[in-house]
A protein has these predicted regions:
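Extended hydrophobic leader/signal-anchor segments used for secretion and membrane insertion
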Residues: 1-160
Length: 160
């Protein structure tokens, strides 16, 4: 239930929300909420509470493609090449040609939202190409709860 990165030892994100998710029994979450990218229960069985390890691609890095990890990087390879990555038995194929390694052309990110239990983020969507990142939120100046009353609709705890 806790976000972690082997290159950073501190807390990533909202530890309270992550603790709340970690304490929730899996049975309390609907399967479409619990299951996570790449949605291959037979090979991975990853959930929003327990997934990884997962290498996040950087431009120039090369990985070996095999029948186990091709599904993790299929969308990235297809995005970068415009081709189709399939797996025939144990042999990944790009546009029908056997491929055993792939060198990434772009940098990618893996974003997770602060509303850990109900955030449609990379745990569902997969990697985000760097060129899709258009900015960084430095300050939240106004946040509104659409389900609050007129007087209690502002989320003052979110203003930083």
């Amino acid at each position: 239930g806790y976000f972690c990165n082997n290159r950073y030892k501190g807390i990533i994100g909202d530890a309270g929300e992550q603790g709340r998710l970690a304490a929730m029994p899996d049975s309390s979450l609907p399967p479409n909420v619990l299951r996570a990218f790449p949605f291959d229960d037979r090979r991975y069985g990853w959930t929003i509470k327990n997934m990884g390890p997962l290498y996040i691609p950087r431009a120039g890095d090369r990985i070996e493609l095999d029948s186990l990890n091709y599904e993790l990087y299929r969308l990235v390879v297809e995005y970068e090449t415009g081709g189709e990555l399939t797996c025939d038995g144990n042999l990944p194929r790009l546009n029908g040609e056997a491929v055993s390694t792939y060198e990434f052309r772009k940098n990618y990110y893996f974003f997770c939202g602060d509303n850990v239990v109900n955030s449609k983020d990379c745990r569902y969507l997969g990697f985000v190409p760097e060129d899709f990142v258009i900015g960084i939120a430095r300050r939240i100046t106004y946040s509104k709860n659409p389900f609050g009353t007129k007087l209690k609709s502002r989320c003052w705890k979110r203003i930083i």
